[in-house]
C-alpha cells in the first residue's frame, strides 16, 4: 500500500515547477485512485497521508530555507489534507469511487488553500497545469477547476488501464480454456462486470475533462483590448539565498536605481508609461511619508514622466510594519497605495507569537506585517491597475477582487531573493499564468532577482528574466474590461459541484452495498473485499 501511494505523490510533485512534467499528474492521480479500492477507512487515511508526503516533501522543499524542523512539521500537516480527502472516498464500487475521489481531493485543496493562517496555494497541483493543455479551464473555475480536472483525468487514466488489463486477462483465460463445443452447450467466458464498469468510468471521466478544456478555450477571456500600455518591469539583480536581515537595503535600492537609469539611457531619455519595481526594494526603518526615499522616488517618477509602482516596507511601530505597493504619477504625486492582504505566516508575521516563541527562534521575524484590507485597485494615469504583492499571485481571490473593482491590467511586485533555488520563482510564474487566464487580464511581474515576467490574458509568457541578473523586461500590454466566468462566479460552482459529487458517491456506495447484501454478492466493479 505504501509504495503506490508515495509514488503517486512523487509523480504529482514532478508535475509542478520547476520540474514541469505536467502530464505525470494524471497517471499519478490515477495510481492513488486505484490504490484506494477496497481499503478500510484507516488504511485510506494512511494512503492519502503518504501520498501527501510524496507530493509536499519535494513540492514544498523551499520551506526548509526558514527552518528544517518547521518545514517538516508544515509538510506533515499539509499531507493531512489529501489524507482526509481519501478517507472521504468510498472504497467501492468503481462508479462511487470515481465520482467522489476527484471531488473530495478538490474540496480538500480548497480548504488547504485558505486554512490555517490564510492557507498555502503554493505547491498545489493546479500549478503544474500552467504549462499544459488544461490551463484554459481556469477561465471557468479558477485553480479549483484545474485541480478537479487533474484528479478526474487521473481516474480516466487508471480506469482505462484497468479496463485494458482486464481485457488482456480475459483473452488469456479464453486462450487457456481451449476450443469450445457449442453442440455440447459450452460458452466462451464473458467480460466481467468490473471490466465494463472501468471502461465506462474511463470514457465518462475523459469526456468530462476534454469537454471542460474545450469549453474553457472558447469561454470569455477578458474581451478585446481597450488600450495598450508600454510597461517595464525592473529587476535590479544581485545574490540569491539570503534573508532580508542579511542584505543591505541601500544596496538593493541602488541596484534598482542603476537598472532604471540604464533603461532610460538606452531609451534616449524616454521611459515607458508604466514602470514596475519589485516588492520590498525600498525598506524603511520608519514611515514612507516625509522620508528621503519618498522624495527620491517622486523625483524619479517626474524625471521618467511615468507611473512608477514600487514595493515598499515601512516600519509603523516597534512591533509592526506595512508591506505595500505605492504608485507615483508622472508629475511625482503619490497617487495610490495597496497594503498586502495575504501575509506569509512565519515569514511576514508570527501567528500566536507568544506561544511559538517558546518553540522556535523568532528573531528572523521581529515584526508582524499589518494586514491590508483593500481590493488591490490602483487608479493611475496608466489606467486602473490591479496589484497583488508577492505570493498573493497564487490566491485567485486577490486578482478577482481587483478585477471586480475595475482593474484592467494586473501587477505583481514580488521578492523571492531569500530562496537559493528556482522552485519558488518558477511556481510564482506558473501562478501568474493561471491568474492572468482566470481573470482575463495581462499581467506584469517584477522581482529584484527574478523571475520578472510578462503574461498575456491567454496565459502566454511573453518574457521572463534570468535569475540574479540586472535586467529590464519590457512589453506593450493590453488593458481589458471584460470578465471571465471565474470573475463572475468565483469558486462557488466548483465547490457546490464537488460537494454534491461526494454525497452522490456515498449514496451510490450505500445503494450498491444494500444490493450486495440482498443478493449475497461479494462486490461490484472490482471493489472486492474491504481490506
What are these regions, as identified by a protein language model?
Residues 167-175, 181, 227, 521-529:
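Short, highly charged, low-complexity non-transmembrane loops/tails of multi-pass membrane proteins
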Residues 218-493:
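Soluble catalytic domains of enzymes that build or remodel membrane lipids, polysaccharides, and related
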Residues 1-173, 180-181, 186, 191-215, ...:
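Membrane-embedded alpha-helical bundles of multi-pass enzymes
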Amino acid at each position: 500500500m505504501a509504495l503506490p501511494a508515495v509514488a503517486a505523490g512523487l509523480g504529482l510533485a514532478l508535475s509542478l515547477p520547476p520540474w514541469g512534467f505536467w502530464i505525470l499528474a494524471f497517471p499519478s492521480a490515477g495510481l492513488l485512485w486505484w490504490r484506494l479500492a477496497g481499503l478500510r477507512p484507516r488504511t485510506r487515511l494512511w494512503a492519502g497521508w503518504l501520498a501527501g508526503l510524496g507530493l509536499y516533501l519535494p513540492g514544498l522543499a523551499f520551506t526548509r530555507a526558514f527552518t528544517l524542523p518547521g518545514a517538516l512539521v508544515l509538510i506533515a500537516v499539509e499531507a493531512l489534507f489529501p489524507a482526509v480527502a481519501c478517507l472521504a472516498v468510498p472504497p467501492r464500487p468503481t462508479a462511487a469511487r470515481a465520482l467522489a475521489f476527484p471531488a473530495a481531493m478538490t474540496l480538500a485543496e480548497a480548504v488547504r488553500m485558505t486554512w490555517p493562517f490564510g492557507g498555502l496555494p503554493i505547491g498545489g497541483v493546479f500549478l503544474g497545469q500552467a504549462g499544459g493543455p488544461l490551463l484554459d479551464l481556469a477561465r471557468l473555475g479558477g485553480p479549483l477547476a484545474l485541480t478537479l480536472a487533474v484528479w478526474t483525468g487521473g481516474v480516466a487514466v487508471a480506469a482505462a488501464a484497468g479496463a485494458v488489463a482486464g481485457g488482456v486477462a480475459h483473452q488469456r483465460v479464453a486462450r487457456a480454456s481451449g476450443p469450445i463445443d457449442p453442440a455440447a452447450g459450452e460458452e466462451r467466458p464473458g467480460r466481467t462486470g468490473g471490466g465494463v464498469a472501468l471502461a465506462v468510468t474511463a470514457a465518462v471521466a475523459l469526456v468530462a475533462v476534454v469537454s471542460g478544456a474545450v469549453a474553457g478555450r472558447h469561454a470569455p477571456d477578458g474581451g478585446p483590448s481597450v488600450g495598450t500600455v508600454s510597461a517595464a518591469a525592473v529587476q535590479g539583480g544581485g545574490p540569491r539565498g539570503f534573508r532580508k536581515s542579511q542584505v543591505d537595503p541601500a544596496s538593493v535600492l541602488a541596484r534598482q536605481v542603476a537598472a532604471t537609469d540604464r533603461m532610460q539611457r538606452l531609451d534616449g531619455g524616454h521611459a515607458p508609461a508604466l514602470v514596475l519595481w519589485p516588492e520590498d526594494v525600498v525598506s524603511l526603518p520608519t514611515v514612507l511619508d516625509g522620508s528621503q526615499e519618498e522624495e527620491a522616488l517622486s523625483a524619479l517618477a517626474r524625471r521618467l514622466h511615468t507611473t512608477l509602482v514600487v514595493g515598499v516596507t515601512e516600519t509603523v511601530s516597534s512591533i509592526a510594519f506595512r508591506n505595500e505597493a505605492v504608485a507615483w504619477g508622472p508629475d511625482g504625486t503619490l497617487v495610490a497605495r495597496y497594503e498586502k492582504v495575504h501575509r506569509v505566516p512565519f515569514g511576514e508575521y508570527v501567528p500566536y507569537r507568544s506561544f511559538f516563541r517558546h518553540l522556535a527562534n523568532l528573531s528572523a521575524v521581529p515584526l508582524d506585517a499589518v494586514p491590508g484590507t483593500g481590493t488591490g485597485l490602483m487608479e493611475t494615469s496608466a489606467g486602473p491597475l490591479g496589484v497583488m504583492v508577492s505570493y498573493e499571485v497564487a490566491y485567485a481571490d486577490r486578482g478577482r477582487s481587483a478585477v471586480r473593482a475595475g482593474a484592467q491590467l494586473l501587477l505583481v511586485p514580488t521578492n523571492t531573493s531569500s530562496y537559493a533555488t528556482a522552485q519558488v520563482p518558477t511556481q510564482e510564474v506558473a501562478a501568474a499564468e493561471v491568474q492572468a487566464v482566470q481573470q482575463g487580464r495581462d499581467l506584469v511581474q517584477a522581482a529584484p532577482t527574478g523571475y520578472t515576467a510578462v503574461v498575456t490574458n491567454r496565459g502566454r509568457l511573453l518574457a521572463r528574466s534570468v535569475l540574479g541578473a540586472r535586467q529590464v523586461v519590457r512589453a506593450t500590454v493590453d488593458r481589458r474590461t471584460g470578465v471571465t466566468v471565474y470573475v463572475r462566479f468565483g469558486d462557488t460552482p466548483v465547490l457546490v459541484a464537488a460537494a454534491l459529487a461526494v454525497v452522490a458517491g456515498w449514496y451510490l456506495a450505500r445503494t450498491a452495498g444494500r444490493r450486495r447484501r440482498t443478493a449475497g454478492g461479494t462486490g461490484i466493479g472490482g471493489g472486492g473485499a474491504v481490506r
